[in-house]
Amino acid sequence: MNDRLSRLRAVLAERGLPALLVSAPANRRYMSGFSGSNGALLITAEAALIFTDGRYVIQVGREAPDFSLREIVIPDRPLSELLIEASVELNLRTVGIEAAHVSVAEHYALAKTMFDSPVELDPVEGIVESLREVKDADELATLRKAIAITDAAITAVIPQLRPDMTERQAAWMLEVAMHEGGGDTISFPIIVAAGPNSALPHARPSNDLLGEGRPIIIDMGALLDGYHADLSRTICLGEPDAQFRTIYGIVLEAQQRALAGLRPELRCNAADALARDYITAAGYGEQFGHGLGHGVGLDIHEGPSLRRAAVGREQNGPRLQAGNVTSVEPGIYLEGWGGVRIEDLALITADGCEVLSKADK
């Protein structure tokens, strides 16, 4: 964690920000290692404090040894009062707060308590998130394990699926397989969507039967030590029809073109275009209604985001970096028939990308 603190402190110095209050759970875990459900970090050029309540005192000692504990006691010593005390002690006049992760109620409580204090709150965005986009060796090792658990689960379950099973039964089988394979839990509610239901990119499993000869989208991932996997496959039980073969072939080719073209310094919207242009040329551009991919790590959706840029801003978007881990998931969705999506996770390397997902497709 010392390296992460050093990198954050360099960013704070560059921005002229003397301190940052880190409250987003994923950012808090990334910076400290603390996995509890309640707490915040105050990080300055010299100090690293963690505020949490009595439930987590022992846990902080185990998970966040680089941080000094300040215990929250409700209602006597809330976070806002502890923050004022620490700010005065550290001679702070400005503290950055994560604007995207502080609710109106939380901001009101902080502002009310600190109204007469010399400390000013400065809303900032994306500071820790930008550091998290490039994975270190420890993160990659955990991600590889989570992905392997996911791959093994879908590989084991698909041969067991039958047309007379429901979507919910299939989803449960996949969840059990990931638990038995070593996952802590699931990264998100598993999607199993058959036939017309698969035209909904974020469908939820129902009591509808899987059936024969129609598309079945499976979207799943194991969560391990805080890190997410994400995998989509489209299968067919029985003999697929001509339309399935055509749509599947287009989506698979689009994904392969994207994977072949990913590399550092490529703009994220240009990465999206690697697949989107092929799908559009095949006549299904309007049926590919989401971005090509998203970063995956401590959050299931994080940066970088591989999607179209706003008109006129195509040359101003963010670029891929070596160390990014991103999903690559083109899809085509036809109302009344169904959809096809194929998703793998890819690591951006020095000269291209490595496909981390290994399940058959």
Please name every model-derived segment.
Residues M1-K361:
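Active-site neighborhoods and metal-handling regions in enzymes and metal-associated proteins
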